[in-house]
Amino acid sequence: MRMIKTYEGMTMNCDVIATIQSVFMNITTGSISEMVDDGFDPDNLEFAVTAFTTFGDEIVLAVYATEEERDYARYKLENWLVYDVGSYY
């Protein structure tokens, strides 16, 4: 069983992760959006990776300063999770 530590410091079982998504996050308010709109202040904009669980919860896994860092982290995380599932068979 693999565990992962979330952005908030919570530890969760990777088996409950249904999907991983790249999002934008307002670090002042904590609001998350799939697209940047006029309500986002560029000075407070960060790039985040979230996970939807099998229970329907959205959890912030990590926050990054650049879009490139976020996308690379998502790629690595998705490969790590797929490798883990494949290792059971």
State what each model feature region is.
Residues M1-Y89:
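Eukaryotic intrinsically disordered, low-complexity regulatory linkers and tails enriched in Ser/Thr/Pro
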